């Protein structure tokens, strides 16, 4: 499936930043139980999942120590995860997501703590589905990998976080609805199997095969129309999976 790249001649500012994370939240809301939605709304003082989906990025600006919580640096060439090496002191997206899910399930945790941890979980599930948050090739997850995108110098991480999605000519509600229409019951059953670690390594393999695999040998690499067409179905499926999996995790944690 690749419904998005056909709509990419217009630049409208949709990124896997605020708007992209909101799309994940909107998809998740479609698959959350009534109980989980009610509990989430109570913890968020009536705010919706999508409206707080980028809170953790805003929080990070004043709390730099939380930066490593948004990603995990699995070496690009590796095929297996080594948590002791790649997540020292449990400071990575896998450990923090698991830690915060445990807090949400803890009947002794106070409401304010649960509210904060819920916002972290919402954001981190989105982050772990961006393949460049799951790898490192000695280039800070693509942040130090120069590329040329639309004739301008950029870096590979920005292209995947924001640049490619800026071509999608949809608002976030319409995009979430379009993506959700393609999600089947079989997809949901398949995508919710495995663990958070499995999902991260799935993203890591996409980084190997597509984000870097289709990049070519030029330095800086040129992000071509063919590269965009290869990346588009990866991006849309990762947004869909993130929404479905976020709903699955919250349905379990907010019983």
Language-model features and meaning:
Residues 14-124, 131-255:
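N-terminal, motif-rich segments that launch catalysis or mediate targeting to/interaction with membranes
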């Amino acid at each position: 499936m690749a419904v998005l790249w056909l709509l990419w001649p217009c630049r409208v500012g949709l990124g896997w930043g605020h708007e992209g994370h909101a799309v994940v939240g909107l998809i998740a809301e479609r698959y959350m139980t009534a109980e989980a939605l009610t509990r989430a709304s109570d913890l968020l003082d009536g705010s919706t999942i999508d409206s707080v989906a980028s809170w953790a990025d805003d929080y990070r600006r004043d709390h730099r120590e939380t930066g490593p919580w948004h990603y995990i640096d699995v070496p690009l060439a590796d095929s297996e995860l080594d948590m002791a090496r790649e997540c020292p002191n449990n400071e990575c997206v896998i450990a923090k997501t698991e830690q915060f899910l445990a807090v949400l399930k803890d009947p002794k945790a106070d409401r304010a703590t649960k509210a904060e941890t819920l916002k972290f979980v919402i954001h981190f599930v989105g982050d772990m589905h961006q393949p460049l948050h799951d790898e490192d090739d000695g280039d800070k997850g693509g942040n130090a990998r120069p590329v040329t995108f639309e004739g301008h110098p950029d870096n590979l991480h920005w292209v995947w976080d924001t640049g490619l999605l800026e071509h999608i000519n949809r608002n976030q509600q319409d995009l979430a609805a379009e993506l959700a229409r393609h999600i089947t019951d079989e997809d949901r059953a398949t995508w919710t199997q495995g663990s958070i670690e499995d999902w991260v390594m799935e993203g890591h393999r996409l980084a190997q095969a597509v984000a870097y695999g289709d990049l070519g040998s030029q330095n800086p690499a040129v992000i071509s129309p063919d590269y965009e067409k290869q990346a588009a179905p990866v991006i849309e499926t990762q947004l869909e999976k993130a929404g479905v999996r976020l709903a699955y995790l919250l349905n379990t944690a907010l019983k």
